Amino acid sequence: MAESDDEYDRKRRDKFRGERDSYRPERRDDRRPMGGGAGNARDEWAERNPFRGSAAAGGGGGGGGVGGGGGARHRPDYSDYRGSGPRPRYGSPGREMPPAKRMRPDWGDGEMRANPRFGYDPYLVQAWNDHYQSLHSAYSHSGHAPSAREPPPSGISNSDTQTQPAMLTLKQFLDTQDENISDSEVMRKYTEYKTDFKRQQLNEFFVAHKDEEWFKNKYHPEDSVRRSDEQRGFLKRRTDVFLELLNNGTISNVKVDSSQADALVRVLDTCVIKLEGGTDEDLKILDEKPKDPAPVYERRSERSERSEATESVVVTKREPESPKHQTKSEKDDDDLPEVESPQRKNVRPVNSDDEDWDDDEEMPAAKSEQQSELAAEKPAKQLNDEESMQANIDKNQKKSKKRKRTSSDDESSSSSSSESDSDSDDEKLIEKYDVEEGLRADQKAEAEKDKEEEEERAATAAAKAKQLPPDSPTPDEDVDAAAVEEQKNEVVAIKTEVNDEESQKTEQPAAEEEKSEQPKDDPEASSKNGEENEEEKAEKSEADTATTKAAAAAADDDAMTETIDVDKLKDSLKPRALHRTSSIFLRNLAPSITKAEIETICTRFSGYLRVAIADPLVERRWYRRGWITFTRDVNIKEICWSLNNQRLRDCEMGAIVNRDLSRRVRPANGITAHKQIVRSDIKLCAKIAMNLDERFKLWSEVDNADNAELNPEELKEATNGSGSYGFNSKNPVLQNITDYLIEEASAEEEELLGLAGDSKDGEGEPIERDEPLIQVLDRLVLYLRVVHSVDYYNHCEYPYEDEMPNRCGIIHARGPAPMRVTSNDVQEYIKSYEGKLQQFLAKTVQLSDENIKELGAKNPEKEVEKFVQANTQELAKDKWLCPLSGKKFKGPEFIRKHIFNKHEEKVDEVRKEVQYFNNYLRDPKRPQLPEHPGSSKRTESESGRGSGGYRPPMYPPFSAMPYGFAPPMMGGGGRGGRNFPQARREMPVEHQRRLIGYHDLDAPVNSDMFD
């Protein structure tokens, strides 16, 4: 039996099979026999078809195989899955172009032509030519631009990568010029052509992207200023947080070392909490250890013996949040447990619902007491119809109380079963996908428990006040008063469980029942004391007034209780975990999508914080990536699912859940702890901090206020004649920094004792640590990380970090140090690391006006004049039209005056557009399409050094003939009679030997001689 597809590939690995078969007139598929036989020993190997019988595999010769002998089972070949049609003669079906083979005689006209001179390549000969380009010709396109199918070199494999069009080489440019043009004129025109080509590409790129938000934030006169102010506000906020941590000693107590990862993470989290507006109370969340997931205790009813017998049934409690979703059968038989599928187990902590567990245990006892009371009252009092109705009302009210007060009337029981079933299904779906319900249960449980305790105390106090009426009631009235108090307590509890609308609905039936109970007690009293009807009426009126006063007092107490509970809940809130967030990653955002559009979609979800959009990449066709940040307690998967079902500007955003950072402290090279490297790092960090502070003008306001009092000479002396660090900086981490940059060494002692450095280089020296230097360096590294989002030990910057889900996410720290280090390793490390940080060390200087003029900068006044001329149209003699307004004038000067007076905003837009374009040109790191590979990668001969500086030689440079053969015949008139010097062979100078001439002594004197 074949172990893999290698058995199928073995046939394709037959090197010369395709070569031999292509020479035969018939096709391979026609020659392949369908039945088993001895003739197909090469095409039908036995091991290729292990599931066929012996007849198919061995041609009926006997045995072998899996099938044994009878009823051979046919297993389709791999070629059967390709469908009908001839099989390509080269390679696998999924490959677009054939592999490089030698030329087929039936493809062309018998020539070894490199590629078609005009048009596209229908036979994909270009693939052959590109593969053997280094062996046959350095000019793959015979003087023409590369075809569209040419794969870009230098490792760029993405065919969707946009590039500039190929610029003409000097040879191609010469083909477009006159034959009699001089060399100097050719060079001048070619230089102009390159300049115009660059201007055109910059202008086209600007026009293509000027309406996109990311481009406006960089260069637009208004949007760029607004974005810069926003970023500067972020930096100032970060600076304030860093100074606060520096003053309270948090920064000084931590080392940027991988061994102190927990302390570093705590510092970063502290910064995030402060940036989010947290207080010192919120910082206590960092001291709490992460809680383990609470154990799940699934309570089973004592009566459900069948659930104990089988393990496939899980009994859970009914949720209190969905009272209207209960069906009629559930209301009639409430004490039965709810049976759910074993695939989904509702995770509930122990303290999530203590009150419900107690109520469930009291349910059987309460029902038995209720039944005994009813059985005792019926023969004694012989209840009439009204009394039976009252008993039913009391029974329903007690039953609803034992059901966690899900309802106070029969509205939910009157709903149709179909609606309740559909609602319950929706509720189950919500529970199924609510992955963080278990996490929120812990937080809600404690708050609800405290709230219920306070409400019970207030209700008890109100009940005691109601139990003392002005006149002592009869024993029967005493029982009724207890029932009234129980109902009032129930109303108070219902108010705390449901919202305001439901509470109003439940209070009205309760108040009506209280009023209906009071006259029901009067007939009993009148039947016992028929002679004292007037006294009973007086007592009834007094009882009514007392009841109304008690109800009003209870309402006031209830309102006060709710107000007090809200204040207490605010005071008793836990520290907020502001450093923990949930986020969604958007993989594809079209360049036309704005940040405001994403915010509009996300603000519909609760817990939305911010959105960050990265700069576009040319490799992704200028598509961008985005991160949407929410609070930690949201259901991030449900939000992600909702975003995936939406399209923005006909673009699928590709939303996925962004995971938390795995390792926030990552180790760097341990050699960085060496004293010499630490001193070099301090110098580099100080330069970077100085450059970034100057770029964003963080300390410029303080410096300007102090330097305003100094003379120019004093100011120059204060800054040491240049912007060097440490002398007049208001940055606290840069003050007195020069004291640590002066290197000390005992050179004289080593010279006297004869201690040479060669021995140290051979054996190496141990790592020398200087704690004061390391402390200064750590303060600088943390300043760069917290304020400027620069990770020094990773020599990179984390852009737009204030809008990202993690505002201080990752930091690199010094790793474990090696035992010994050589001087060469130290010097090499310092040199290489300084090169990696050049992007931060070099100051960003905008291009001057002279430089941008060469790139095609525009003049505002000239562009305004062009705008006026474009909107001045002559209709007839002394009749001119302004297209902006449609008005007609007698002369162009009137239109000019009209445009400047009535369309001033249009003129301002033209000036802003000019400034917009010039700002783009001033940026030395401006985004633009990469150069075409054919333009950027040229050989020396293409750049104009061979053939007199203009024309390259026309023979293959990489496959030159062996030494001793004459060079190609390119002398004489050259192309078109031009007198170019004779071409030299493209060989290295050391291999070019002088030609030796042999002179015959008998020959005439004036014969040809080489020397």
From Swiss-Prot:
Q: Which InterPro entries match?
A: SE/Ars2, SERRATE/Ars2_C, SERRATE/Ars2_N
Which N-terminal residues, if any, form the signal peptide?
Answer: none
Q: Does the keyword Nucleus apply?
A: yes
Biased composition annotated in UniProt, kind: Gly residues: 56-71
**Example of a GO biological process term:** primary miRNA processing
Residues that bear Phosphotyrosine: 90
Bias kind Low complexity: ranges: 81-95, 544-554
Cysteine disulfide partners in this protein:
none
Provide the positions where the record notes the PTM Phosphoserine.
Answer: 92, 322, 352, 472
Where is this gene product found?
A: Nucleus
Renumbered residue ranges of the record's region Disordered = 1-113, 138-162, 284-558, 919-953
Where is it found, in Gene Ontology cellular component terms?
Answer: nuclear body; nucleoplasm
Q: Where is the composition biased (Basic and acidic residues)?
A: 8-33, 41-50, 103-113, 284-309, 316-331, 375-384, 427-450, 512-543
Please list the coiled coil stretches.
none
Q: Does the keyword NAD apply?
A: no
Q: Where is the composition biased (Acidic residues)?
A: 352-363
According to the record, the segments passing through the membrane are none
Q: Which PANTHER family match?
A: ARSENITE-RESISTANCE PROTEIN 2, SERRATE RNA EFFECTOR MOLECULE HOMOLOG
Entry function: Acts as a mediator between the cap-binding complex (CBC) and RNA-mediated gene silencing (RNAi). Involved in innate immunity via the short interfering RNAs (siRNAs) processing machinery by restricting the viral RNA production. Also involved microRNA (miRNA)-mediated silencing by contributing to the stability and delivery of primary miRNA transcripts to the primary miRNA processing complex containing drosha and pasha.
Give the family per the record. Answer: Belongs to the ARS2 family.
Assembly and binders: Interacts with cbp20, Dcr-2 and pasha.
Its protein name is: Serrate RNA effector molecule homolog
